[in-house]
């Protein structure tokens, strides 16, 4: 086991302490967030000399839950003062590259993929990381039953419990720890790890603690299908096809870790019966009821059975397998090259690393490159070390933060101009200036002119990020007080619009990464089990509103560029937004919780098209819906359960971020009574802290039916709502 956890290089182990649970804890004053042109990596300074030479910054202290040392501010009496106090705090968190770093965690099945990849490739796990990952997982363990869900708010399940139990054991936790005894008991009550969803079984097979017969096939031969085939992977949702590519390579090789003492012990711990007595093939379709949120269609089960019982033993030719594996390997190489070994997600990243280990060997350049970039996915907070859903959300956060600062007058305020200028420089630097190489071969859409979620190095364009990035640039470049040394020229802004226009689907809506490639009927092939909507590129209200709003802003500055096409795209987008409205007035969101989030963006898009409460039935219905959800304390509070129920579910408490969203939606729509907005802003101001910030409440974002933390939302959305109130109604005392 010790060969997998790296050695301390100094006397740093003497700096360790024990937390309230008796677990080892690192010295938080030694953690540093390295920012290399937007690439973020947490580093632990083991030597006293390093620690003294590199004092901890305000952002680092804040992320770690330490005292920032910032002064207390007088309690704000007006919305403008509250907004400016918020900007003051937010500006202190900007990193040297001009961006804002943040946590983007939530799903609990992602970290195990990365740790297993580290383990099976014999890549040393930094000891400080191992300690803090253990702390984070124990902090996220559910007290009532000892398990973990598939995301942090979810009920315990086989996927969360099996995978996170394994991670804790790989990182040195004892099987006799009372918390692991409780988790093991729960897992056995589900039937053991053989009752976990297919993706969990896959990673357990890679680790060598389950037999491959237990896993439904991941046939690389799918990649030999012509693009004309409606089920070809090129038609799938981009995350599913990218993950499938490297997973299918590993599955086809039937590769497993050779094993060590820990994995031998896990073979006995993960199951209620002896490992040698398990008929793994009989459990290929076994699934705990608690994980079966999206039952597979009978045709999918039939296809899997025919593949296992007929195709593989009798029809699968060696030459076909070799051709398929070669095609998949070329796609893996292209993905690594185009994303600079960062990958689309931690899952595809981890699987690509293992595929490179199998194909190129342990000491290869590809494995080394993966080992260097994998750190960009980890995030430290006060509870320990987690794994972000991506390598960061730098562009997304920076775009929205700078809009909030500008709304509060920061662009014209000498105190904050350097902050805004640095943010502009970051956004200018991270616009994608070309398409990927071998675009058609690797099934990538046009990205030139767009912006990514994180950085240009990762390189995946996202519609919302392109829309908000474009709006931010336009807003800043029109501010005459700013001395912008490197303005983005018109042709690059035109490229951004070209990129957006390429993304619109036949419905008028927009997806996340690309135009829909396949039929909506691909949803019949859903295999997510615990999470749904994994096969199809769907239209999303938030993506559509971001594009429609960006095109509206662009037309103000460049009214003649592709005038008819821009107007047509806006009109069709607005029609989609209206058609997506529920009969009772709400819009169902996907990437933020939920009706409150989508409602804000939808009402803004309608307003930019001249449709407000006074002249638009959709706007009136949207406002009436939002006002009906205001709580007695003046705030709004919506549970993430709205994702799954597809109806507004109340949270037990009002939420600052959702209150800001609701207030913004009402103000965008020019709701005639400012009383609900004023009540909401009073709640926001009452929760503002003495440094100018707001505390973390419920996770704000969404993925599938689960939650994601967008930890900067609580810092800039309230500012934006307060500033918008001042712009519309004046700076009255509250």
Curated annotation (Swiss-Prot):
One of its GO terms (biological process) is ergosterol biosynthetic process. PFTB repeats lie at residues 130-172, 493-534, 570-610, 619-668. This is Terpene cyclase/mutase ntnI. It is an enzyme of class 5 (isomerase). The record marks 396, 453, 591 as: Transition state stabilizer. Keywords: Isomerase, Repeat. GO terms for molecular function: lanosterol synthase activity. It comes from Nectria sp. The lineage of its organism: Eukaryota, Fungi, Dikarya, Ascomycota, Pezizomycotina. Terpene cyclase/mutase; part of the gene cluster that mediates the biosynthesis of the meroterpenoids nectripenoids A and B, as well as cochliquninone D and isocochliquninone E. The pathway probably begins with the HR-PKS ntnH that catalyzes two chain-extension steps to form a reduced triketide, which then primes the SAT domain in the NR-PKS ntnG to initiate three more cycles of extension to give a linear hexaketide corresponding to the polyketide part of nectripenoids. Residues 16-26 have a biased composition (Basic and acidic residues). The keyword Isomerase applies. Belongs to the terpene cyclase/mutase family. Pathway: Secondary metabolite biosynthesis; terpenoid biosynthesis. Residues 1-26 are annotated as: Disordered. Transmembrane segments: none annotated. Pfam families: SQHop_cyclase_C, SQHop_cyclase_N. Residues 1-12 have a biased composition (Polar residues). GO terms for cellular component: lipid droplet. CDD domains: SQCY_1. Its EC number is 5.4.99.-.
């Amino acid at each position: 086991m010790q060969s997998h956890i790296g050695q301390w290089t100094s006397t740093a182990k003497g700096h360790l302490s024990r937390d309230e649970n008796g677990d080892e804890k690192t010295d938080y004053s030694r953690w540093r967030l390295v920012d290399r042109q937007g690439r973020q990596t947490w580093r632990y300074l083991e030597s006293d000399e390093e620690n003294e030479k590199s004092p901890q910054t305000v952002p680092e202290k804040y992320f770690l839950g330490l005292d920032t040392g910032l002064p207390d501010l007088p309690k704000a009496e007006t919305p403008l003062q509250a907004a400016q106090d918020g900007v003051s705090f937010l500006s202190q968190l900007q990193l040297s590259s001009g961006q804002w770093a943040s946590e983007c965690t939530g799903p609990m099945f992602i970290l195990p993929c990365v740790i297993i990849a580290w383990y099976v490739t014999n890549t040393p796990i930094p000891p400080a990381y191992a300690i803090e990952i253990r702390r984070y997982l124990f902090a996220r363990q559910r007290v009532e039953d000892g398990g973990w869900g598939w995301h942090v708010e979810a009920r315990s399940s086989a996927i969360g419990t099996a995978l996170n139990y394994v991670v804790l054991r790989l990182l040195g936790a004892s099987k006799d720890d009372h918390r692991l005894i409780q988790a093991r008991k729960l897992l056995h009550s589900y039937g053991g790890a053989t009752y976990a969803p297919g993706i969990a079984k896959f990673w357990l097979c890679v680790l060598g603690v389950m037999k491959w017969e237990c896993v439904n096939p991941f046939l690389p031969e799918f990649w030999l299908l012509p693009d004309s085939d409606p089920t070809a992977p090129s038609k799938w949702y981009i995350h599913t096809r990218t993950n499938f590519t490297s997973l299918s390579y590993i599955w086809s090789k039937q590769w497993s870790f050779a094993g060590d003492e820990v994995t031998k012990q896990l073979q006995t711990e993960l199951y209620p019966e002896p490992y040698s007595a398990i008929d793994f093939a009989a459990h290929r379709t076994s699934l705990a009821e608690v994980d079966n949120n999206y039952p597979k269609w009978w045709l999918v089960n039939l296809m899997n059975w025919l593949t296992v019982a007929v195709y593989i033993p009798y029809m699968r030719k060696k030459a076909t397998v070799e051709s398929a594996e070669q095609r998949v390997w070329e796609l893996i190489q292209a993905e690594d090259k185009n994303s600079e070994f960062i990958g689309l997600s931690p899952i595809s990243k981890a699987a690509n690393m293992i595929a490179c280990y199998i194909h190129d060997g342990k000491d290869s350049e590809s494995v080394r490159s993966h080992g260097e970039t994998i750190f960009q996915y980890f995030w430290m907070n006060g509870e320990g070390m987690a794994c972000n859903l991506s390598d960061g959300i730098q562009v997304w956060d920076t775009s929205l933060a700078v809009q909030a600062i500008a709304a509060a007058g920061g662009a014209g305020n000498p105190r904050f101009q350097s902050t805004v200028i640095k943010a502009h420089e970051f956004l200018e630097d991270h616009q994608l200036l070309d398409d990927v190489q071998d675009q058609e071969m690797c099934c990538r859409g046009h990205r030139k002119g767009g912006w990514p979620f994180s950085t240009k190095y990762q390189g995946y364009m996202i519609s919302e990020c392109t829309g908000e990035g474009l709006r931010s640039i336009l807003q800043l470049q029109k501010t005459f007080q700013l001395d912008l040394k490197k303005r983005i020229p018109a042709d690059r802004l035109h490229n951004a619009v070209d990129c957006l226009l390429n993304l619109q689907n036949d419905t008028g809506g927009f997806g996340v990464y690309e135009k829909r490639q396949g039929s909506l009927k691909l949803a019949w092939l859903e295999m997510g089990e615990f999470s749904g909507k994994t096969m199809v590129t769907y239209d999303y209200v938030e993506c559509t509103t971001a594009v429609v709003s960006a095109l509206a802003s662009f037309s103000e500055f460049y009214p003649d560029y592709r005038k008819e096409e821009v107007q047509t795209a806006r009109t069709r987008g607005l029609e989609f937004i209206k058609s997506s409205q529920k009969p009772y007035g709400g819009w169902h969101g996907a990437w933020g919780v939920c009706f409150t989030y989508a409602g804000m963006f939808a009402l803004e898009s309608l307003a930019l098209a001249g449709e407000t409460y006074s002249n638009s039935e959709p706007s009136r219905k949207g406002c009436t819906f939002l006002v009906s959800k205001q709580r007695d304390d003046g705030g709004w509070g919506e549970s993430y359960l709205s994702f799954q129920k597809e109806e507004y579910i109340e949270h037990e408490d009002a939420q600052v971020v959702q209150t800001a969203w609701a207030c913004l939606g009402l103000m965008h729509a020019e709701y005639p009574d400012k009383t609900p907005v004023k009540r909401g802003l009073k709640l926001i101001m009452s929760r503002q802290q003495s440094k100018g910030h707001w505390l973390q409440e419920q996770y704000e974002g969404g993925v599938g039916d689960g939650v994601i933390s967008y930890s900067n939302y609580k810092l800039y959305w309230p500012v934006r709502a307060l500033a918008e109130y001042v712009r519309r109604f004046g700076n009255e005392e509250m």
